[in-house]
Structure formats: C-alpha cells, structure tokens
UniProtKB/Swiss-Prot annotation:
GO terms for molecular function: RNA binding. The lineage of its organism: Eukaryota, Fungi, Dikarya, Ascomycota, Saccharomycotina. Residues 1-109, 178-264 are annotated as: Disordered. Its main location: nucleus. GO terms for biological process: mRNA processing; RNA splicing. It comes from the Eukaryota. The keyword Ribonucleoprotein applies. Residues 64-80 have a biased composition (Acidic residues). Component of the spliceosome and rRNA processing machinery. In association with the spliceosomal U4/U6.U5 tri-snRNP particle, required for splicing of pre-mRNA. Belongs to the SPP381 family. This is Pre-mRNA-splicing factor SPP381. GO terms for cellular component: spliceosomal complex. Component of the 25S U4/U6.U5 tri-snRNP particle, a subcomplex of the spliceosome.
C-alpha cells in the first residue's frame, strides 16, 4: 500500500516537471529569440530542481514507512486470530402490542397455578399415605394386644377359676328359680281355667243360684217356674244378682307377677 502511494507521488512529480518544460518551451517560442531567460523561467527551473532534490528524500522516507508497515502486517499475520461468538438479536414483532403482553402474563399465571395445584396434590397424597401407614400400625398393635389378652386369659389363677365357678352356680340357681316360678304360675292358671269351666257347666235356678244336684232342683217352688214360663223370652235378658261364691271361683288371679319386674 505504501509502495503504491510512493509510485503515484513520483508520477505526479514527473508529470509536473514535464508540464513545466512544455510551458517553458512555449514561452520561448512566443518570445522569439530573446536575450536571456526571464524571472518566471528561472523560478520554474529552481522549483524543478528542488523537486528533484526532495524526491529522493521523500522516496526514502516512504520506503522506510512501507518497510515498517510490511513488518507490522507480517507480525499481525503471525498472531492468532481471535473470533468472537456472534450474538443473534431477536427480531421484534411489530404486531405484538398490549394484547400480546397480556396473553403472555396470563399464560405465566396459568403455569404458576398448575404448578401450585400439582404441589398441593402431591402433599395431599403424601398425607393420605402417612395416615394409612399410621392406622395400619395402630391396627397391628391393637391385634397384638388382643392376642396378648387372649393368651393371658388361658393362664388364669386359682382365685379367678373359683370365682368363675361360683358365678356359674349362681346362674344355674337363678335359672332353676325362674323355671319353678314359671311352672307355679302356669299351674295356677290351669286351675283357675278348670274352675271357670266347671262353674259355667252347672245349671242355674230362677234366683240365679247354681245347683250341684237334683235335690236342690226338687225343692224349687212351682211359682217361680210358672212365673218364668209366663215371662217368656224376655226372661233370659234379665240381669241376675251376682253371688259371692260364684265371683270368687270365676275371678282370675292377679297377673302382676307375669311382668319383667316380678322376677326381681
């Protein structure tokens, strides 16, 4: 690059000198055969000579600069080239406005809500499993205690056996007493029923007194029989006086002892 600059500058200097010589020739031709060079010509010649004198120094300086540039370029080429990682920028959507931002916010809220629900469901399941494990261990412990009690019951002491025997005897006596009471009550009911049937089978006279034999029927006055015949069918609807022996035989016994409090 420095070499090109130097060549371009040298061509400019040579072109400038050639143009000066041409102008000088033209001026000489115009003036004709003058006595000597004019002041302008002398100045042009001095400038040309100064340019030729400065050209080697400029060329040397430019050559030195070109050498330095070549050395720097060669040293830079020798160094390792560092390539940076490219950064890609997202292209903004011009149509994304407040509605898009609102949708993004709502989507984030829904995702957060789903995560919370999932976390709560996991906690509920763990709690249920813990309760099941606790109840299972409690049931096992309860069954173990029951089995231990049954095992302890097989090895009763002598006092406990004696107490159980006494309780069994009391229960047997109580059952016998209740059975005897039931038998006695049943026999009384049967006797009362038999007496009632016997009293209902005996004939009644006109006065309403039951007679046991024919002797009593023979001593009955005739006037009463005649009066009964005269009364006709209305006589059977006439109420009669209740006698004490009849009431005593037909009355049923008290049933207060048949309830659940009679055994106590």
């Amino acid at each position: 690059m420095a070499i090109r600059h130097f060549r371009r500058q040298r061509e400019q200097v040579t072109s400038g000198s050639s143009s000066d010589t041409e102008t000088s020739d033209v001026s000489e031709q115009d003036t004709g055969a003058g006595e000597g060079p004019t002041e302008a010509e002398t100045r042009a010649e001095g400038a040309e000579q100064g340019a030729w004198e400065r050209a080697p120094s400029v060329a040397g300086s430019e050559a030195g600069e070109s050498d330095e540039d070549d050395s720097e370029s060669s040293s830079s080429d020798d160094e390792e080239v560092v390539l940076h990682r490219p950064v890609f920028l997202k292209k903004r959507d011009p149509g994304a406005g407040p509605a898009a931002r609102t949708g993004a916010v709502s989507g984030a809220q829904e995702r957060t809500l789903d995560q919370v629900q999932h976390h709560n469901a996991v906690q509920d399941k763990e709690r249920a499993l813990k309760q099941i494990a606790t109840s299972y261990s409690t049931d096992k412990e309860l069954l173990h205690r029951i089995a231990q009690l049954e095992t302890d019951g097989d090895t009763d002491s002598d006092s406990e056996r004696r107490e159980h025997e006494l309780w069994a005897q009391r229960r047997h006596q109580r059952m016998l007493r209740l059975r005897e009471e039931e038998r006695r009550r049943q026999s009384e009911l049967e006797e009362n029923e038999a007496a009632r049937l016997t009293n209902s089978a005996l004939p009644m006279d006109d006065a309403g007194i039951q007679t046991a034999g024919g002797a009593e029927r023979g001593t009955r006055p005739a006037s009463s029989s005649d009066a009964r015949k005269r009364r006709g069918p209305e006589a059977k609807f006439k109420p009669s006086k209740v006698q004490k022996p009849q009431l005593k035989r037909t009355a049923s016994p008290s049933r207060a002892d048949e309830n659940e409090f009679s055994i106590l």
